Regions:
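Substrate-binding/active-site clefts of carbohydrate-active enzymes
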Residues: 151-330
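The feature marks proteins involved in alpha-glucan
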Residues: 1-34, 70-177
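Short S/T/G- and acidic-enriched coil/turn segments that sit immediately N-terminal to beta-strands
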Residues: 64, 74-77, 185
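Conserved aromatic beta-strand anchor motif in extracellular beta-sandwich/beta-rich domains
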Residues: 51-55
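Short proline/glycine-enriched turn/loop motifs at strand-loop junctions of beta-rich domains
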Residues: 42-49, 83
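Structural beta-strand segments of beta-rich domains
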Residues: 35-40
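Surface-exposed loop/edge segments in extracytoplasmic proteins
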Residues: 58-66, 100
Length: 330
């Protein structure tokens, strides 16, 4: 295609021909089986695409790079034979001669700070009784909503939550906690049950960018409205953010505990912008997923520096796929 300016890309992406030739309705991301994993990446403007394999989600060298094969609608894919559970990967996508290493926009788990994607057997992340978990039916008289940040829910030592679980998903699973351990004033899950709330609305729990998961002792705080990976949980809310499967399992444990207490779960989502413009989506298909002005500059209706181009077919598909994934898997 040759080097294109943002304005030229905008014209391309909004053309009927581009939509007709590149809109893809099939599955994307990793498809795990014990026999092997297929990776599929939508990158229609790429000249080349490759997968980089790692043993760990951080601080390890690449153990191999393999080319992806281009297919219809600009979907690149590769089959990795053997049980790939627990292996980490990134993609290198070359557009206009510029190679960018990036995570998988459809990854189901990731390493420290979400910089590397992880292949995960989701069946291994299911807590005990997960297959029987169902959201409770909340009668009309109890349909009140209590909004909370996962961190704020239990971070204070006065919460009575065990230290390793404070500010984490697992704090929602601990029962019998009282203020300063006084045995009188309930906290956390016991407090919610006494309030009689019907639903807990969790402020963003998918992977966000402003908290460094590698520095848990550093005083850091954000509500989470700065997403970096839409399809797996935030690592700072897990007890071991370096192991990608832990955040998935512990998020499910939190949801199961709330359901067991008769409380429904509402997930606050942020699809209108991302933390940085250089992100897994923009590194894969530059300028496609974010709205531009006529001169190619970024539109900023979100007030956060970029705004999601939900009118474009594959951006809309991405949002819907992500929402369905959370609703069905969690």
């Amino acid at each position: 295609m040759g080097t294109m300016t943002p304005a030229q890309r905008r014209a391309l992406y909004e053309s009927a021909r581009f939509a007709r030739e590149t809109t893809y309705n099939g599955p994307l991301g990793p498809e795990y089986t014990p026999a092997g994993t297929r990776l599929q990446l939508w990158a229609p403007t790429a000249e080349q695409a490759a997968v980089n394999l790692y043993r760990k989600g951080h601080d390890s060298l690449c153990i191999g790079t393999l080319p992806l094969q281009r297919g219809p609608q600009g979907v690149w894919s590769i089959w990795l034979p053997g049980d790939q559970h627990g292996h980490y990967y990134t993609f290198t996508v070359t557009v206009d001669g510029v190679a960018r290493e990036t995570g998988d926009p459809y990854a189901r788990a990731g390493g420290l700070n979400g910089l590397r994607s992880m292949i995960v057997d989701l069946a291994r992340t299911a807590p005990a009784g997960w297959v029987r978990d169902v959201r409770p039916v909340i009668p009309p008289a109890r349909r009140s909503v209590w909004e909370v940040s996962v961190r704020d829910f239990s971070q204070d030592a006065a919460s009575g939550v065990r230290p390793a679980w404070r500010g984490k998903f697992l704090a929602f699973t601990q029962t019998g906690t009282t203020l300063h351990g006084d045995g009188i004033h309930p906290t956390c899950l016991n407090y919610l049950k006494r309030l009689g709330v019907g639903y807990v609305q969790l402020m963003p729990i998918f992977d966000f960018g402003s908290v460094d998961e590698a520095k848990p002792l550093l005083r850091q705080y954000n509500w989470g409205y700065d997403p970096t990976n839409y399809n797996f949980p935030e690592g700072s809310y897990s007890t071991d953010p370096a192991r990608g499967e832990v955040r998935v399992r512990e998020c499910k444990e939190m949801i199961a505990a709330l359901h067991a207490a008769g409380i429904g779960v509402i997930m606050d989502v942020v699809y209108n912008h991302m933390y940085r413009y250089e992100n897994v989506l923009n590194n894969t298909v530059p300028d496609y997923f974010f709205r531009q002005n006529e001169d190619g500059s970024l539109s900023n209706g979100s007030g956060c520096g970029n705004e999601f181009a939900s009118e474009r077919p594959m951006a809309r598909k991405y949002m819907i796929d992500s929402l369905l994934y959370w609703a069905q898997e969690y």
